[in-house]
Amino acid sequence: MTEQSASTTVKITTENGLHLRPADLIARRAAEFESAIEITKDGNSVDAKSILSLMTLAAEKGSELAINATGPDAQAAIDALAELLINDFDELHQTNVQEE
């Protein structure tokens, strides 16, 4: 079976950028996939399944992130992570509402 690969680029639009809670959401979502997933900012690539690695990107509002995946579910992984980033971490907002 041939390895699939997929990639996309997204821009961080949330006011606080990629802080701990969004990094946690990304890492948890990425962990649902078998594919290897990397996120790159300014030439620095990190494992999307690692919260600490994601934090090292220091991605602020307006930062462009390249998401690359290789593996059997690469396109699904890219789609899921891009959706999370494009929708300003909707799950985070829903969690905040439920906690209040």
Write out the residue ranges for each language-model feature.
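Acidic-glycine-rich active-site phosphate/pyrophosphate-binding loop
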Residues: M1-E3, A31-E32
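Compact, glycine-rich, soluble single-domain proteins
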Residues: K11-K61, I86
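Low-complexity, flexible helical/coil segments
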Residues: N16, N44-A48, P72-D79, E100
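C-terminal structural segments of small proteins and small subunits
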Residues: E64, N68-V97
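Intrinsic-disorder/low-complexity, polar/charged segments enriched in Ser/Thr/Lys/Arg/Asp/Glu/Gln
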Residues: E3-T9, E64-A66
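N-terminal loops that bind phosphate or other acidic moieties
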Residues: E3-A6, I51, T95-E100
